[in-house]
Amino acid sequence: MKNILLLFPLSILMSLPESEQIGICTNAIGEVYRSGKIRSGKIRKGESIYNGDKISTDKNAFISLLNIQDKSVISLYGNSVIKLFGSAEKDSIKTEINIFGGRVSAELRKTRNRKFVVNTPSSVAVVKGTTFLAGHRTMNDHGPKYQGVSDCVFSVLNGKLEVQNTKSGKTIKVEEGKTVISTLNGEFLIFETTDEFTQYFKEPK
């Protein structure tokens, strides 16, 4: 209990206020919306993205944003929902994406003292200097190597990332050119990253 009490104030110090701008929309196609403490409604190119914003896209929509803290580029594709957070203390920066559904890609710079975390219903991924694709598929979704259960898919285009399955507690390092499927059953399935995975991460024309 003492440890919990000590950590709680620290987390408050590290979290940016919800009024803090953490990004800017560099491109928006179709119906893209957000709900947040500062603004809610449709997102347009050039608008600010704030700490804690929940962003959603319609079927054929797309949004790309620049994280002004760590200069990472984050893209969200059709039928997707995420929540974006940023925190900072002294020289360290942390970016956190919660994926509730759909597909996200990110291109990260190799920056010291920066942590990038992706949370999904079945997994937590820690990323450093990596270009990757991430998606959460429900039981009603279909796609490559579909297992018939809710799962999360991570594809590494360059660099590497570490994924922990929250059901089993198992951790796996995913190298460049590999794709891992992490299931709610606690399993990891490894594949080569091919077009059958990347075809779902394209900007609509």
Locate predicted features.
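Flexible, surface-exposed loop/linker segments and immediately adjacent secondary-structure boundaries
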Residues: 18-54, 58-60, 66-205
